[in-house]
Amino acid sequence: MAKEKFERKKPHCNIGTIGHVDHGKTSLTAAITKVLAEAGGATFTAYDQIDKAPEEKARGITISTSHVEYETPNRHYAHVDCPGHADYVKNMITGAAQMDGAILVVSAADGPMPQTREHILLARQVGVPAIVVFLNKCDMVDDPELLELVELEVRELLSKYNFPGDKIPIIKGSALAALENSDEKLGRDAVLELMKNVDEYIPQPERPVDQPFLMPVEDVFSISGRGTVVTGRVERGIVKVGEEIEIVGIRPTQKTTVTGVEMFRKLLDQGQAGDNIGALLRGTKREDVERGQVLCKPGSVKPHTKFKAEAYILTKEEGGRHTPFFTNYRPQFYFRTTDVTGVVHLPEGTEMVMPGDNIAMEVHLIVPIAMEEKLRFAIREGGRTVGAGVVASIIE
């Protein structure tokens, strides 16, 4: 029997559950698979299967994450759930499991708690585009006024971190009721209502191939009689033979024209997101281009040296530093394909950063790098990863 071809007829979207410990993230994840399985859009995955999340390595950091997939009538979803708070922090900062949107789970019995706040802040810092809220454990709250208060608190918290708190859908329900079939309205119906809102409210992500062209430079060769070939994996967009592109980062931006695209020694008329290609550049000398620069659509990305970042610093056990660092710390920042030295400025009131901390900090690089918000990087000391980060905003 031939293996069934995976046909993706529906648009794909990556989401995840976030929120305070024990507010019901994993139960909700299980409940979604159970309810959608009845409609044939998922395989039911029980709580304990999701809870024993396998460990993965992302940028040298060990993270436990569980992945489930399911579909609604409109979309195919990959859903990520993490067992521990530290795993969420690492996951969101490294972008190990990318999120196009998040389901914030808040227990109606407790209201927003410290990690609720921290996950919303992280979602803002790492650029999660949209959040839908599931007010869980509503079967434990008899007073409708109390529910309204919790809802108001959640909306205020979201607004505080620049999410549209007054517009975000909040669905009241109970993941346990859905799993135990005890209360149709708070259980199954609430989960279906949640997924309807996730479908409608979380915007469909733009596919990498539809975004402006960008390719990090991995290697540069000179081919006699042909010119200079730059190799790398196209990160996004499409590049066609004959198109004008820019070389951005490290040195002043240069314009050039792509006169050929090669893949596996064959000449193509274009290269697109995901392809490993060699691009032949007109009139560009071998010494004009270096690893760490990017080829991109003119005007789409600018070089920057100063930015604000959210970073996670590895523990000693993860192979990180054994000691704290202070402001003016000078490690290397590994962006895409190269290390650049930078100086760290800690926020006022933060004396030092301990291994295992996550921190908002300002970085000044010694040379400019092609960057934009949401770009991930590693923090390294002599080739050893000591942290991971994401560009939260650009200063200059």
Curated annotation (Swiss-Prot):
Function of the protein: GTP hydrolase that promotes the GTP-dependent binding of aminoacyl-tRNA to the A-site of ribosomes during protein biosynthesis.
Protein location: Cytoplasm
Region G3, annotated ranges: 81-84
Keyword Hydrolase (UniProt): yes
UniProt similarity note: Belongs to the TRAFAC class translation factor GTPase superfamily. Classic translation factor GTPase family. EF-Tu/EF-1A subfamily.
Enzyme nomenclature, EC number: 3.6.5.3
Group of enzyme by EC: hydrolase
Quaternary assembly: Monomer.
Start and end residues of each tr-type G domain: 10-206
Name recorded for this polypeptide: Elongation factor Tu
Keyword presence, Hydrolase: yes
Binding positions for Mg(2+) per the UniProt entry: 26
Ligand binding (GTP): 19-26, 81-85, 136-139
Coiled-coil boundaries: none
Chain segments annotated as transmembrane: none
G2 as annotated region, ranges: 60-64
Chain spans, region G5: 174-176
Molecular functions (GO terms): GTP binding; GTPase activity; guanosine tetraphosphate binding; translation elongation factor activity
GO CC annotations, alphabetized: cytosol
Entry keyword set: Cytoplasm, Elongation factor, GTP-binding, Hydrolase, Magnesium, Metal-binding, Nucleotide-binding, Protein biosynthesis
Annotated spans, G1: 19-26
A Pfam family the protein falls into: GTP_EFTU_D3
Catalytic activity: GTP + H2O = GDP + phosphate + H(+)
Species this chain originates from: Afipia carboxidovorans (strain ATCC 49405 / DSM 1227 / KCTC 32145 / OM5) (Oligotropha carboxidovorans)
